[in-house]
């Protein structure tokens, strides 16, 4: 499947491919970042088990640990954010194929900034469910993330 210019385009292409292969609109699809190679089997099983009968779907997430600040464009703190209401979105994210396809396609037409599948579903008026996962399912985006992952995996032996 050919990737798109952004994540949403890549996922949309994958969903179109699934449709072409005979997948139904009410089939579940899971979207996972290749940049998150440390997904645990327990988290995957938990996500599948807790969302299988959910009307919308959802995603793995972890509660924010650190104090969070909202800043202005100059880097000045405007306020401290209540972290009890803030979660970090992880993957995989699990939604019905048809609903996710419509949400992504419509958001692209509307030129809405979509950062993950859950944000597309939110834009479409749905409320995805958060399933608490492990914090070590981190996204490898910085050199120190890769070094942490290498150390973690070398300790498994």
Residue ranges of model-derived segments:
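Short phosphate-binding loop-to-helix
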Residues: 1-26
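Acidic metal-phosphate-binding loop of nucleotide-sugar-dependent transferases
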Residues: 7, 34-38
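Conserved core of the sugar-phosphate nucleotidyltransferase
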Residues: 25, 38-129
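Short aromatic/hydrophobic "clamp" motif used to bind/position activated sugar donors
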Residues: 29-30
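Glycine-rich beta-alpha junction loops
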Residues: 63-66, 135, 144
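Hydrophobic helical membrane-anchoring modules
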Residues: 137-157
């Amino acid at each position: 499947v050919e990737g798109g210019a952004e994540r949403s385009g890549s996922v949309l292409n994958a969903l179109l491919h699934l449709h072409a292969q005979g997948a139904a609109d009410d089939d579940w699809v899971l979207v996972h970042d290749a940049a998150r190679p440390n997904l645990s089997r327990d988290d995957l099983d938990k996500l599948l088990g807790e969302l299988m009968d959910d009307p919308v779907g959802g995603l793995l997430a972890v509660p924010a640990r650190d104090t969070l600040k909202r800043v202005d464009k100059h880097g000045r703190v405007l306020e401290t954010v209540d972290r009890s209401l803030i979660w970090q979105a992880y993957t995989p994210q699990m939604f019905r194929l048809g609903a996710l396809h419509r949400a992504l396609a419509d958001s692209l037409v509307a030129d809405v900034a979509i950062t993950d599948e859950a944000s597309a579903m939110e834009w479409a008026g749905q409320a995805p469910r958060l399933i608490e996962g492990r914090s070590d399912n981190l996204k490898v985006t910085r050199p120190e993330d890769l070094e942490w992952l290498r150390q973690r995996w070398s300790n498994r032996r």
